[in-house]
A protein has these predicted regions:
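C-terminal motif of bacterial Sec signal peptides marking the signal peptidase cleavage site
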Residues: 6-10
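Acidic Gly/Asp/Thr-rich repetitive segments characteristic of extracellular carbohydrate-active
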Residues: 219-262, 522-531
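Conserved aromatic anchor
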Residues: 41-52, 145-156
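Recognizes extended acidic, P/S/T-rich segments that occur
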Residues: 57-97, 161-192
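Extracellular beta-rich repeat passengers
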Residues: 267, 275, 279-516, 521-539
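Proline-enriched interdomain boundary motifs that mark the N-terminal boundary
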Residues: 24-34, 130-138, 222
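Extracellular fibronectin type III
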Residues: 14-23, 98, 109-132, 193, ...
Length: 539
């Protein structure tokens, strides 16, 4: 009975036994588990110490470890504690490779008593987290066809790859590039304009950093490309002068980086012309802060790589907050209105509104790669708002909606539209109290070709007691759509398939209240493929 009692309690730290009488050795330790650290090259082991042990040895290896394997005999073995420094738990192991599976074992040691048997994890192994030695890529590091990459100086790295999708487009051998390794920087040329790339840096076959970037767009071609100077300001007079120079019908107005254009009157586009307002690449996008824009019969109006800001002026030059970008009351048919790679900041009401005229039709409205932030006050309108005319196709692509102040994404007052497509979007803090994400005012109208939502996150509502989903007669088709548990709808629930994340928006994102929607939770099933692309995890 005594031996049975000893065997049952021998691993209990509360007993007074230090030696297994049957085998005259230290007891083996219970391993609680390993926590991989965010740094990627470290992991912390917790274990129960045993009495009589003076120190502990830990061995990890990329190769399988078991009792018949002599300590340190595998090609990838790392041994911690040979200097007798490990005397307590927990212990943080350093010098590991990131994103790598390791096997682990531990034994207790003493100068007076034979060592314990090896102790193993319940599943024998653990995996380190992905490492990130790349620094953030700034606009100053990018051009139309190049990128400057920065990483931890003097880091152990051997190779760098640039991928377009899954295809490796550039490979750099760093083993003999002492300058790049010492300084932690390299310039990659020969890239395509306006293209998404991924950079990976390796130590042998282990990834030590992964970062995505998009090269700048080239100035769009047109019948006339007009390059504004830094001392010019967008106005009706300048627009008329530019249009008069055009021998065709399409005009690109290229605006210098870092400039600000404030105009206190409605900017009147000329009938029959297409206009692209393009921001030249630089450290800061050019700012357009004009009272509003009045459209005519235009094939295209496009804003690309600019900041559209509500911080404007009135006709007398006094500061005011603008309410709309487009607030159309005059008859007009416009084929395409596009916002691409734009920051749209602080408007009191809609970005595009059709007022009470049935003679207004916007055949296609697109948001692509934008960041949209509303005012911190209650708005009367939706991001897109139709009182009497007609929207055709509506597309929200790869866009972040930080929607404090907006009622919802889309409103059409008893009028059908052609379609609504939402893809790769992060949508935060809508709808407003008593409002809808999408609203056709009744269930008698809707998007005739359906409402399609893919790879999108809905996080938080403005009022959890009175938020509603979609009011329409549209077929709703969802794929890879996620909600946080602070996105609660009290009516007009989504009929498409939605997956719930077990956490709030603050559990999912780094700092949503401050506009940082970087996904931080490894428990989120859509971390690689949901939400606006810039915020996703890479692995």
């Amino acid at each position: 009975m005594l031996l049975t009692t000893i065997a049952a309690t021998s691993c209990d730290n509360a007993n007074d036994w230090t030696v297994d009488a049957a085998h005259n050795r230290l007891f083996s330790c219970d391993l609680s588990g390993v926590t991989p650290e965010d740094i990627g090259t470290e992991a912390t082991l917790e274990f129960k110490t045993v009495k009589g042990a003076e120190y502990y040895l830990i061995e990890v290896s990329k190769d399988t470890l078991y009792n018949d394997i002599e300590m340190g005999s595998t090609a990838t073995s790392i041994i911690y504690g040979e200097d007798k420094s490990i005397k307590e738990s927990p212990y943080t192991m350093t010098g590991l490779d990131s994103s790598t599976k390791y096997y682990l074992r531990l034994k207790a040691m003493s100068g007076n008593t034979p060592e314990s048997k090896w102790s193993y994890l319940s599943d024998y192994s653990f995996k380190t987290k992905s490492e990130q030695i790349f620094e953030e890529i700034s606009t100053a590091d990018l051009t139309e066809n190049s990128v400057v990459l920065h990483w931890l100086a003097n880091a152990e790295v051997t190779k760098l790859e640039i991928l377009k999708g899954e295809e490796v487009k550039v490979t750099k051998d760093l083993t003999n590039d002492n300058e790049a390794v010492t300084n932690g920087t390299i310039t990659i040329d020969g890239l395509e304009a306006q293209t998404n790339y991924t950079a990976k840096i390796y130590k042998d076959n282990v990834v030590r950093g992964t970062i995505g970037f998009t090269t700048f767009a080239a100035v769009p071609s047109a019948d006339l490309v007009y390059r504004m100077t830094a001392d010019e300001n967008l106005s009706n007079e300048l627009l008329a002068e530019i249009t008069a120079q055009c021998e065709g019908t399409s005009i690109t107005i290229a605006m210098p980086a870092g400039t600000t254009n404030k105009y206190g009157e409605a900017l009147e586009l000329v009938d029959g012309y297409s206009y692209t307002f393009f921001g030249i690449a630089g450290e800061k996008k050019p700012v357009i802060a004009i009272s509003t824009i009045t459209l005519k019969n235009n094939a295209l109006i496009k804003f690309q790589n600019v900041e559209l800001n509500a911080d404007g002026i009135n006709a007398e030059g006094t500061a005011k907050t603008n309410e709309y970008i487009i607030n159309q009351s005059a008859a007009a048919v416009v084929d395409n209105i596009t916002f691409e790679d734009c920051d749209i900041i602080g408007f009191k009401n809609s970005i595009v509104r059709i007022q009470s005229s049935s003679s207004i039709e916007f055949k296609k409205v697109v948001f692509n790669g934008c960041y949209i932030k509303g005012q911190n006050l209650a708005s009367k309108y939706y991001v897109l708002h139709n009182n009497s005319g007609k929207f055709g196709e509506v597309e929200y692509n790869n866009t972040t909606f930080d929607c404090t102040g907006y009622r919802g994404l889309f409103y059409s007052e008893n009028k059908d539209c052609t379609s609504i497509n939402i893809t790769d979007c992060t949508i935060y803090n809508i709808p407003a109290s008593g409002q809808y994400v999408i609203d056709f005012k009744s269930t008698n109208n809707g998007a005739t070709n359906g409402i399609i939502i893919n790879n999108t996150i809905f996080a938080k509502v403005q009022d959890a007691s009175a938020a509603k989903g979609i009011r329409s007669n549209s077929v709703q088709t969802f794929d890879n759509v996620w909600t946080t548990n602070d996105f609660k709808l009290t009516g007009n629930q989504f009929s498409g398939t939605v997956t719930a994340f077990d956490g709030t928006s603050t559990d999912l994102f780094e700092n949503p209240a401050a506009g940082d929607f970087t996904i931080k939770s490894y428990n989120f099933g859509g971390r690689l493929n949901a939400g606006a692309i810039k915020w996703r995890m890479t692995e």
